[in-house]
């Protein structure tokens, strides 16, 4: 899991770790979508 301050913090980690193209920052944790 990746901590974040905003959705912009999540895009690269989501792509690198999961291959998911979409992401959001929810409760200071990245959520990855579109896997």
From Swiss-Prot:
GO CC aspect terms: extracellular region
Disulphide bridges, residue numbers: 4-25, 10-30, 14-32, 20-35
Marked site positions, Aromatic residue of the functional dyad: 33
Basic residue of the functional dyad, annotated site positions: 24
Result after altering residue 24 to A: 500-fold decrease in LD(50), 600-fold decrease of potency in competition assay with apamin, and 17000-fold decrease in inhibiting Kv1.2/KCNA2 channels
Site (Part of the basic ring which may anchor to the external vestibule of the K(+) channel): 5, 12, 28, 31
Expression across tissues: Expressed by the venom gland.
Record-level Gene Ontology MF annotations: ion channel inhibitor activity; potassium channel regulator activity; toxin activity
InterPro entries per UniProt: Scorpion_toxin-like_sf (IPR036574), Scorpion_toxinS_K_inh (IPR001947)
Keyword Disulfide bond among UniProt keywords: yes
UniProt keyword annotations, A-Z: Calcium-activated potassium channel impairing toxin, Disulfide bond, Ion channel impairing toxin, Neurotoxin, Potassium channel impairing toxin, Secreted, Toxin, Voltage-gated potassium channel impairing toxin
The UniProt record lists the keyword Secreted: yes
Result when mutating residue 12 to A: 51-fold decrease in inhibiting Kv1.2/KCNA2 channels
Predominant location: secreted
Localization in the cell: Secreted
Free-text note regarding domains: Has the structural arrangement of an alpha-helix connected to a beta-sheet by disulfide bonds (CSalpha/beta).
Note: Pi1 analog that is synthesized with a phosphorylation at Tyr-33 (P-Pi1) suffers a 200-fold decrease in LD(50), a 200-fold decrease of potency in competition assay with apamin, and a 58-fold decrease in inhibiting Kv1.2/KCNA2 channels.
Family named by the database record: Belongs to the short scorpion toxin superfamily. Potassium channel inhibitor family. Alpha-KTx 06 subfamily.
Role, per record: Potently and reversibly inhibits the insect voltage-gated Shaker (Sh) potassium channel (isoform alpha (B)), the mammalian voltage-gated potassium channels Kv1.2/KCNA2 (IC(50)=0.44 nM), and the calcium-activated potassium channel KCa2.3/KCNN3 (Kd=330 nM). Its effect on Kv1.3/KCNA3 is controversial, since this channel is voltage-independently inhibited in PubMed:9464266, but is not affected in PubMed:10931199. Furthermore, this toxin competes with apamin (a small conductance calcium-activated potassium channel inhibitor) for binding to rat brain synaptosomes.
Protein name in the entry: Potassium channel toxin alpha-KTx 6.1
Native source organism of the sequence: Pandinus imperator (Emperor scorpion)
Organism classification: Eukaryota, Metazoa, Ecdysozoa, Arthropoda, Chelicerata
């Amino acid at each position: 899991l990746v901590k974040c301050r905003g959705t912009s913090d999540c895009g690269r980690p989501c792509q690198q770790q999961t291959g998911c193209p979409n992401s959001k920052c929810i409760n200071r944790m990245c959520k990855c979508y579109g896997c």
